[in-house]
């Protein structure tokens, strides 16, 4: 439980002006705040319309000041702890969302003894410390607030509702049961029958759990990638229209377009929502041999980012009979899929186009070739549809929502799986004490995952990303 004795308050809704503003108060003096501003404490969990006024104190506690103009008529709610979002006494004021109204209420709360402004994420941190949320749910809440696409929202919502945390709790209970078996064997060292009966079930549970976690970790980092977004690099020779393609995909002038070769020197990143999935489009420098050291650096960066991307769109000029094919470093085994975009199809009429005239798109597995025009938009609808489908398949591999969404989750689960493997490796030796210790380490790793143990060093990092009032 939280050992704080102070009470915090903050604006929890968006920055005014707005139709409605919500001010929250949490802590032992929340009742005093209600009495000071609203004159009374409403029935628990019932929205009550009350007139807020500026409080005063005569040394015997805060009181409603009837001699001054009221601040606002507000819906007031009272949530006695521990049946509240933070686990503490909590009050909520739903106000009209003007600057002056919000400022007056915050100023009035600041005069109530024992109240102070909240820091970033402090309401959520108190909920965590009071057992209302485990750490995976806290991270899910942070991701939900920061979600920019529908897929990110779904993943964050599942995490907030315990998709990983609940499973980790079930795993911990199974580990506790296995550990109890092993410790029973240690407590009765002379009972061979007892030892044989309990060690085997314990190790069988450990093996099963290790396999479950290992299967979970073999997910191609889908959860982390969904938080970060799919990376698509637009690459190719100079003057083939890469920047025009980026601008057409993003529906804005994100990149400079020029008839002069080598205009793009550095990598331009553009973020967009593609079919509900987060995507980062990279406009890279045209690849060619050059004596210009600045352009040469840009070409080097382009090669490196293309190799590290999830998909490469290699752009060629449809008006040329012989165009530069994708280089070997992009088509090697283990590299990203490479789609070929034959651009300037509007100018290729009557010339020797690269692609056959009887089809604009050829797709085979993860490979594709599109005949497009960045100028007219020809076949771009087909290209965008293909990219959206690729993103859907990329993030939906395995069917169910990803459980592991952060590197912290992955590290804790990897530590747990390794401890379980070490425990199982001691089966032949019969060293119950070592088996028990490895099972304890596995349980401790799961405890770190959900925030039960060894998390003080990560709490500040997690909560600093929250806004004030959350």
Model-derived regions: residue spans:
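Conserved beta-strand segments of alpha/beta enzyme cores
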Residues: 116, 278-280, 368
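Short, acidic/hydrophobic/Gly-rich beta-strand patch recurrent on exposed beta strands
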Residues: 24, 246, 283
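C-terminal-of-GTPase-core extension/linker across diverse P-loop GTPases
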Residues: 2-15, 55-58, 150-273, 290-292, ...
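Switch I (G2) and immediately adjacent beta-strands of P-loop GTPase domains
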Residues: 51-59, 63-80, 262-290, 308-311, ...
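A glycine-rich (often HGG/GG-containing) alpha/beta subdomain
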Residues: 1-154, 158, 162, 334, ...
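Alpha-helical scaffold elements adjacent to nucleotide-binding pockets in ATP/GTP-utilizing enzyme cores
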Residues: 108, 140, 305-308, 386
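Inter-motif core of Ras-like GTPase G domains
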Residues: 295-319
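Conserved G/P- and acidic residue-centered "switch" motifs that form tight phosphate/ATP-binding loops
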Residues: 131, 239, 283
């Amino acid at each position: 439980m939280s050992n704080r004795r102070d009470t915090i308050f903050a604006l929890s809704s968006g920055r005014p002006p707005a139709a409605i503003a919500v001010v929250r108060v949490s802590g032992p003096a929340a009742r005093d705040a209600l009495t000071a501003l609203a004159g009374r404490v409403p029935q628990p969990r019932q929205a009550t319309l009350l007139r807020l006024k500026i409080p005063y104190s005569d040394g015997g506690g805060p009181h409603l000041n009837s001699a001054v103009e009221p601040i606002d008529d507000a819906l007031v709610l009272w949530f006695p702890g521990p049946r509240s979002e933070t686990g503490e006494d909590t009050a909520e004021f739903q106000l009209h969302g003007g600057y002056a109204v919000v400022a007056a209420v915050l100023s009035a709360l600041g005069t109530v003894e024992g109240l102070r402004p909240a820091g970033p994420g402090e309401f959520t941190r108190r909920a965590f410390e009071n057992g209302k949320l485990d750490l995976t749910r806290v991270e899910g809440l942070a991701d939900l607030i920061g979600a920019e696409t529908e897929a990110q929202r779904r993943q964050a919502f599942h995490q907030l509702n315990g998709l990983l945390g609940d499973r980790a709790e079930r795993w911990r209970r199974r580990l506790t049961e296995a550990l109890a078996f092993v410790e029973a064997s240690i407590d009765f060292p002379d009972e061979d029958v007892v030892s044989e009966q309990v060690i085997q079930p314990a190790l069988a549970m450990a093996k099963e759990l290790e396999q479950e976690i290992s299967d979970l970790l073999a997910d191609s980092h889908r959860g982390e990638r969904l938080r970060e977004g799919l990376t698509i690099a637009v690459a190719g020779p100079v003057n083939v229209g890469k920047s025009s393609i980026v601008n057409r995909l993003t529906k804005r002038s994100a990149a400079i377009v020029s008839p002069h070769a080598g205009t793009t020197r550095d990598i331009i990143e553009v973020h967009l929502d593609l079919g509900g999935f987060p995507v980062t489009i990279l406009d890279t420098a045209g690849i060619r041999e050059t004596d210009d050291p600045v352009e040469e650096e840009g070409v080097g960066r382009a090669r490196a980012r293309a190799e590290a991307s999830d998909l490469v769109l290699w752009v060629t000029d449809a008006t040329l009979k012989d165009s530069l094919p994708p280089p070997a470093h992009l088509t090697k085994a283990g590299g990203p899929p490479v789609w070929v975009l034959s651009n300037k199809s509007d100018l290729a009429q009557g010339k020797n186009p690269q692609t056959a005239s009887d089809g604009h798109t050829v797709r085979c597995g993860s490979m594709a070739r599109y005949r497009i025009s960045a100028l007219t938009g020809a076949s771009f609808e087909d290209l965008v549809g293909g990219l959206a489908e690729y993103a859907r398949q990329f993030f939906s591999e395995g069917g169910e929502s990803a459980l592991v969404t952060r590197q912290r989750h992955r590290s804790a689960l990897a530590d747990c799986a390794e401890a379980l493997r070490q425990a199982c490796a001691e089966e032949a030796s019969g060293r119950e004490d070592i088996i028990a210790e490895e099972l304890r380490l596995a349980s401790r790793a799961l405890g770190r995952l959900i925030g039960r143990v060894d998390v003080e060093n990560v709490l500040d990092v997690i909560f600093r990303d929250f806004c004030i009032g959350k």
